[in-house]
From Swiss-Prot:
Entry keyword annotation includes Disulfide bond: no
Compositionally biased spans, kind Basic and acidic residues: 104-113, 122-143
Protein source organism: Hamiltonella defensa subsp. Acyrthosiphon pisum (strain 5AT)
UniProt xrefs under PANTHER family: MITOCHONDRIAL 28S RIBOSOMAL PROTEIN S6, SMALL RIBOSOMAL SUBUNIT PROTEIN BS6M
NCBIfam families in the record: S6
Gene Ontology BP term (one): translation
Known function: Binds together with bS18 to 16S ribosomal RNA.
Protein's name according to its UniProt entry: Small ribosomal subunit protein bS6
Region (Disordered) location: 100-143
Protein backbone atom coordinates (compact mmCIF):
# COMPACT_ATOMS: atom_id res chain seq x y z
CA UNK A 1 0.00 0.00 0.00
CA UNK A 2 1.12 3.52 -0.71
CA UNK A 3 1.11 6.59 1.50
CA UNK A 4 -1.04 9.58 0.56
CA UNK A 5 -1.60 13.11 1.79
CA UNK A 6 -5.17 14.26 1.21
CA UNK A 7 -6.35 17.84 1.60
CA UNK A 8 -9.91 18.89 0.90
CA UNK A 9 -11.72 22.20 1.23
CA UNK A 10 -15.33 22.29 2.38
CA UNK A 11 -17.86 25.04 1.65
CA UNK A 12 -17.87 27.38 4.70
CA UNK A 13 -21.65 27.01 5.14
CA UNK A 14 -21.15 23.25 5.53
CA UNK A 15 -18.51 23.48 8.29
CA UNK A 16 -20.79 21.75 10.77
CA UNK A 17 -20.80 18.64 8.54
CA UNK A 18 -17.00 18.31 8.51
CA UNK A 19 -16.74 15.80 11.43
CA UNK A 20 -19.22 13.52 9.67
CA UNK A 21 -17.32 13.83 6.41
CA UNK A 22 -14.03 12.99 8.13
CA UNK A 23 -15.67 9.95 9.71
CA UNK A 24 -17.15 8.82 6.38
CA UNK A 25 -13.85 9.18 4.50
CA UNK A 26 -11.91 7.51 7.33
CA UNK A 27 -14.32 4.57 7.18
CA UNK A 28 -13.73 4.20 3.42
CA UNK A 29 -9.98 3.97 4.04
CA UNK A 30 -10.08 1.60 7.01
CA UNK A 31 -12.68 -0.74 5.48
CA UNK A 32 -10.47 -1.23 2.44
CA UNK A 33 -7.57 -2.28 4.69
CA UNK A 34 -5.90 1.12 4.87
CA UNK A 35 -4.50 2.95 7.85
CA UNK A 36 -4.87 6.59 8.92
CA UNK A 37 -1.68 8.17 10.23
CA UNK A 38 -2.85 11.73 10.85
CA UNK A 39 -6.07 13.77 10.73
CA UNK A 40 -5.94 17.55 11.08
CA UNK A 41 -8.93 19.85 10.97
CA UNK A 42 -7.46 23.24 10.08
CA UNK A 43 -10.80 25.02 10.37
CA UNK A 44 -11.94 27.99 8.33
CA UNK A 45 -9.18 29.77 6.49
CA UNK A 46 -8.99 32.69 4.10
CA UNK A 47 -8.59 31.70 0.44
CA UNK A 48 -5.87 33.25 -1.71
CA UNK A 49 -8.49 33.96 -4.36
CA UNK A 50 -12.26 33.65 -4.58
CA UNK A 51 -13.68 30.26 -5.54
CA UNK A 52 -17.33 30.38 -6.61
CA UNK A 53 -17.52 33.88 -5.07
CA UNK A 54 -16.41 32.52 -1.68
CA UNK A 55 -13.42 33.90 0.21
CA UNK A 56 -13.18 31.29 2.99
CA UNK A 57 -13.21 27.51 3.19
CA UNK A 58 -12.90 24.80 5.84
CA UNK A 59 -9.68 22.80 5.39
CA UNK A 60 -9.02 19.17 6.38
CA UNK A 61 -5.77 17.19 6.05
CA UNK A 62 -5.46 13.39 6.11
CA UNK A 63 -2.27 11.33 5.92
CA UNK A 64 -3.16 7.76 5.07
CA UNK A 65 -1.77 4.47 3.86
CA UNK A 66 -4.35 2.92 1.55
CA UNK A 67 -4.81 0.71 -1.51
CA UNK A 68 -5.60 2.31 -4.86
CA UNK A 69 -9.26 1.24 -4.80
CA UNK A 70 -9.81 3.26 -1.59
CA UNK A 71 -8.22 6.34 -3.18
CA UNK A 72 -10.43 5.92 -6.26
CA UNK A 73 -13.51 5.72 -4.04
CA UNK A 74 -12.42 8.86 -2.15
CA UNK A 75 -11.96 10.73 -5.44
CA UNK A 76 -15.47 9.69 -6.48
CA UNK A 77 -16.89 10.80 -3.12
CA UNK A 78 -15.14 14.17 -3.43
CA UNK A 79 -16.39 14.64 -6.98
CA UNK A 80 -20.05 13.97 -6.13
CA UNK A 81 -20.13 15.85 -2.82
CA UNK A 82 -21.21 19.45 -3.51
CA UNK A 83 -19.83 20.60 -0.16
CA UNK A 84 -16.25 19.72 -1.18
CA UNK A 85 -14.99 22.72 -3.14
CA UNK A 86 -11.49 21.43 -3.97
CA UNK A 87 -9.37 18.42 -3.11
CA UNK A 88 -5.80 17.27 -3.59
CA UNK A 89 -4.48 13.73 -3.22
CA UNK A 90 -0.71 13.47 -3.31
CA UNK A 91 1.36 10.29 -3.12
CA UNK A 92 4.04 10.38 -0.42
CA UNK A 93 7.22 8.33 0.05
CA UNK A 94 6.57 7.59 3.72
CA UNK A 95 3.99 8.07 6.46
CA UNK A 96 3.87 11.56 7.92
CA UNK A 97 2.73 11.61 11.54
CA UNK A 98 4.14 14.83 13.01
CA UNK A 99 2.05 18.00 13.14
CA UNK A 100 1.88 20.13 10.04
CA UNK A 101 3.42 23.62 10.06
CA UNK A 102 -0.06 25.17 10.11
CA UNK A 103 -0.98 23.41 13.36
CA UNK A 104 2.41 24.26 14.87
CA UNK A 105 1.87 27.94 14.02
CA UNK A 106 -1.61 27.84 15.59
CA UNK A 107 -0.17 26.34 18.79
CA UNK A 108 2.61 28.96 18.92
CA UNK A 109 0.13 31.78 18.40
CA UNK A 110 -2.11 30.38 21.11
CA UNK A 111 0.85 30.25 23.53
CA UNK A 112 1.82 33.84 22.68
CA UNK A 113 -1.74 35.04 23.19
CA UNK A 114 -1.96 33.21 26.52
CA UNK A 115 1.32 34.75 27.66
CA UNK A 116 0.34 38.26 26.61
CA UNK A 117 -3.12 38.05 28.16
CA UNK A 118 -1.77 36.71 31.44
CA UNK A 119 0.88 39.43 31.43
CA UNK A 120 -1.66 42.14 30.75
CA UNK A 121 -3.85 40.87 33.59
CA UNK A 122 -0.89 41.20 35.96
CA UNK A 123 -0.28 44.73 34.69
CA UNK A 124 -3.94 45.58 35.18
CA UNK A 125 -3.82 44.25 38.74
CA UNK A 126 -0.69 46.32 39.45
CA UNK A 127 -2.34 49.46 38.05
CA UNK A 128 -5.47 48.75 40.06
CA UNK A 129 -3.38 48.38 43.24
CA UNK A 130 -1.56 51.63 42.51
CA UNK A 131 -4.86 53.44 42.01
CA UNK A 132 -6.16 52.10 45.32
CA UNK A 133 -2.96 53.16 47.09
CA UNK A 134 -3.25 56.70 45.67
CA UNK A 135 -6.88 56.99 46.70
CA UNK A 136 -6.07 55.68 50.18
CA UNK A 137 -3.22 58.18 50.53
CA UNK A 138 -5.46 61.04 49.37
CA UNK A 139 -8.17 60.03 51.80
CA UNK A 140 -5.75 59.76 54.73
CA UNK A 141 -4.24 63.19 53.88
CA UNK A 142 -7.67 64.78 53.90
CA UNK A 143 -8.48 63.40 57.36
Amino acid sequence: MRHYEIVFMVHPDQSDQVPGMIQRYSTVITQSGGQIHRIEDWGRRQLAYAINKLHKAHYVLLNVEAPQNAINELETNFRFNDAVMRNLIKRMNHAVTEESPIIKMKDERREVVELTTSGSEDNQKDHHKEDLDKKTDEFSEEN
